[in-house]
Amino acid sequence: MAPHDLLTALRDQNPLVHCITNYVAMNIAANVVLAAGASPAMVHAPEEIAEFTPICGALTINIGTISTPWQASMMAAAATASAQNIPWVLDPVAHFISVYRREAAQQLLAQRPTILRGNASEILALTGETGAGKGADSGDSVDAAQGAAKKLAAQFGTVVAITGPVDYLTDGTREAQVSGGSSLMPQVTALGCSQTALMGAYAATGPAFDAALAALAHFKVAGSTAAQRADGPGSFQMHFLDALANTQPFELAQVIR
């Protein structure tokens, strides 16, 4: 599906997106999904997973503030989504900073996410390569991680998105790049995490590669628009949500190459 068709479908269908994300990201992730035209649900109790995940259009998992109870919820939700062909997105935030986090990320990856999203350092580290990441921030270039992305796509049958100044997307065969956005985007905490939630919304409406591409493009368009109106990171966040809501479908194709 073309990006403009996916944005139209997302707004028409208003899919329910199950977001298991981190404490820092919950508010902005929910608002990003709402602004785009979908419906977020921040459900993470293990006791609810079996009933809730199956009624959602997509699942997103972000390990930013993972703990043992949340890990149980993530694994159960991922297994449910995979078993019931519900698209799901994995964001292995800073998985390289501890043994616990690395093991959790690898266990989730083994569940074969529909889309894997990360920065260059996170994607490199998933293949065992040493990156230069600092916490949740990347110290590696998107270009340097493209080979790792293709390897992961082939190994796990997933679409891999590397986010950065110019985003890169591959399913192991097809490739795309998305430009635009703003240097203010990394200055708003958890904005990148909220993109994972947006990818889930798009994945509920169309094929995985097309959905990830549309989500990347929507973010870049909104970032560019918001930057023209913002005085700094605080006002940028406000204008970014407005820009997501007001993005016209035809604009998405303008940032894709």
UniProtKB/Swiss-Prot annotation:
Pathway note: Cofactor biosynthesis; thiamine diphosphate biosynthesis; 4-methyl-5-(2-phosphoethyl)-thiazole from 5-(2-hydroxyethyl)-4-methylthiazole: step 1/1
InterPro entries: Hyethyz_kinase, Ribokinase-like
UniProt-annotated binding residues for ATP: 117, 163
Enzymatic class: transferase
Reaction(s) the record says it catalyses: 5-(2-hydroxyethyl)-4-methylthiazole + ATP = 4-methyl-5-(2-phosphooxyethyl)-thiazole + ADP + H(+)
NCBIfam families: PRK09355.1, thiM
Classification via HAMAP family: Thz_kinase
Protein name: Hydroxyethylthiazole kinase
Species this chain originates from: Roseobacter denitrificans (strain ATCC 33942 / OCh 114)
Gene from which the chain derives: thiM
